[in-house]
């Protein structure tokens, strides 16, 4: 995954930004105007949360707002790469259709001139020992699993005083409920085995969204923050980063500074707030909005903030989990439709041919689905779930290509499947500026940790504020949470000055 992305500025406009500027004109007063001109605001991180916060502040007249980004690329977990004959997303890909004001969908909808498409239903073929599993069985199990993902059985278990041990973590819950469903719904041992392997594939798909093993995930993640992806989301064929480009259209180089890794955040006492970068530059601030990824906070919060953050916030950072969703793309010289006729979900011995002997640890056991990228004739996406993420990121290209080609040949029962020309994969967990890709509720955390992490610090004014996908229960862990949380903290600063003017 490259860190540098060439900004392709387009002649687009955002209707909400223009509207916000007009609203700001109506609210002008001498004191408020002075605050807009003089207040220094530093946003740490140019991911979607940081960019959304800065854009919201700038559109309301707070011109002395600056974003400091450690890498040479803005956009955070939105990272589009040109690959083969298409554009591939190494991070966030789908946009949920959500009409709320601060959603990613609203931003996408207001980005003029950008093509958008709805994901079309794609019934993957489940393969067991080279044979296709009955689609009716797949559809039934998929429906039942979606009910489990919405936590329907959790409240029922609590109310009836059932086996609460199965609620220790998400995997225990899934296994217990799926075993019960299989026992009731399928009588023949062969059908039970097939059903169990389908459920296992769906468990891995769930894990692929969070980027972790489900044994680590608190059952509260299901009840408070449903994870199952929307069935008909939007995607941008030319890359989701076009939306990010639109966000920065009215920012100059002084307001968006890349290649600025932060080494220290001095957040109190009030007159001395500042952000120091590793290159020696220092930025004084009246307000600091921290949008650093949870993985970075976990590793560096103890040395980054001066003074040290309060204990409850440090505990929240420690308790929340941080996964690593993995993206793998393969590009072929000739159209892949010659040998791949649809999305495939391999099960059982297709994933591990040595299962009857001594099971070997192999990353291909975690493959969920192999599918053609919608806008391409030459690029495959390999969906991986469950675990082994760091191991896969470090695997040499040749070894990875050898193993995935072997799996593809077993799936289509043909040794004529060619080797890919190119490989593209993400490396979120090993990137020092991310150290992972998506937060989740670990078995040691709860919704309260999200609220503690999001709480601003400061005696009289919000001096240090926190935004990012780990700071919002609504859409927790998604780009919607990143965007809305950035706007939330920007609005908190705006409201502080509006209140000061009215009280004064």
From Swiss-Prot:
Major localisation: cytoplasm
Keyword Membrane: no
GO molecular function, one term: polyamine oxidase activity
UniProt tissue specificity: Low levels seen in adult heads, thorax, abdomen and ovaries, high levels in testes.
Alphabetical UniProt keywords: Cytoplasm
Localisation per UniProt entry: Cytoplasm
Keyword flag Nucleus: no
GO-annotated cellular components: cytoplasm
Highest taxon of source: Eukaryota
Protein task: Has a non-vital function.
Annotated protein name in UniProt: Protein anon-37Cs
Protein's gene: anon-37Cs
């Amino acid at each position: 995954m490259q860190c540098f992305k060439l900004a392709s500025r387009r002649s687009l406009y955002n209707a909400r930004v223009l509207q916000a500027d007009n609203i700001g004109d109506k609210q002008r007063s001498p004191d408020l105007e002075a605050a807009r001109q003089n207040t220094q605001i530093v946003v740490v991180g140019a991911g979607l949360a940081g960019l959304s916060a800065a854009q919201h502040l700038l559109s309301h007249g707070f011109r002395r707002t600056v974003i400091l980004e450690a890498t040479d690329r803005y956009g955070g977990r939105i990272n589009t790469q040109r690959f083969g004959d298409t554009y591939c997303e190494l991070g966030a890909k789908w946009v949920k259709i959500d009409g709320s004001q601060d959603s990613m969908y609203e931003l996408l909808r207001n980005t003029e001139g950008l093509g958008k498409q709805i994901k079309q239903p794609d019934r993957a073929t489940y393969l067991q020992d080279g044979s296709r599993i009955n689609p009716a069985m797949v559809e039934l199990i998929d429906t039942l699993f979606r009910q489990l993902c919405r936590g329907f059985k959790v409240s029922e278990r609590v109310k009836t005083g059932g086996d609460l041990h199965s609620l220790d973590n998400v995997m225990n819950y899934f296994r217990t409920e799926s075993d019960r469903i299989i026992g009731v719904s399928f009588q023949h041992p062969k059908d039970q085995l097939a059903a169990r392997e389908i459920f296992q594939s769906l468990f891995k798909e769930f894990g692929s969204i969070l980027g972790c093993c489900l044994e680590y995930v608190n059952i509260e993640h299901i009840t408070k923050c449903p994870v199952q992806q929307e069935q008909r989301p939007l995607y941008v064929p030319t890359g989701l980063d076009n939306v990010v480009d639109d966000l920065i259209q009215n920012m100059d180089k002084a307001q968006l500074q890349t290649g600025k890794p932060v080494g220290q955040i001095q957040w109190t006492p009030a007159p001395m707030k500042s952000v120091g970068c590793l290159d020696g530059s220092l930025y004084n601030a009246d307000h600091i909005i921290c949008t650093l990824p949870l993985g970075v906070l976990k590793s560096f919060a103890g040395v980054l903030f001066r003074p040290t953050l309060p204990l409850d916030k440090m505990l929240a950072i420690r308790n929340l989990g941080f996964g690593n969703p993995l993206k793998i793309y393969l590009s072929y010289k000739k159209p892949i439709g010659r040998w791949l006729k649809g999305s495939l979900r391999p099960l059982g011995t297709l994933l591990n041919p040595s299962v009857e002997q001594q099971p070997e640890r192999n990353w291909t056991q975690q493959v969920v689905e192999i599918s053609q990228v919608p806008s391409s004739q030459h690029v495959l996406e390999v969906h991986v779930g469950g675990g082994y993420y760091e191991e896969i990121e470090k695997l040499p290209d040749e070894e990875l290509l050898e193993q995935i080609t072997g799996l593809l040949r077993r799936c289509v029962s043909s040794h004529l499947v060619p080797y890919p020309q190119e490989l593209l994969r993400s490396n979120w967990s090993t990137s020092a500026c991310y150290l992972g890709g998506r937060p989740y509720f670990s078995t040691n955390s709860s919704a309260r940790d999200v609220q503690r992490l999001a709480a601003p610090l400061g005696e009289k004014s919000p001096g240090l504020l926190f935004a990012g996908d780990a700071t919002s229960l609504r859409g927790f862990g998604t780009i919607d949470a990143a965007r809305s949380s950035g706007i939330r903290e920007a609005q908190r600063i705006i409201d502080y000055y509006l209140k000061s003017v009215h009280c004064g």
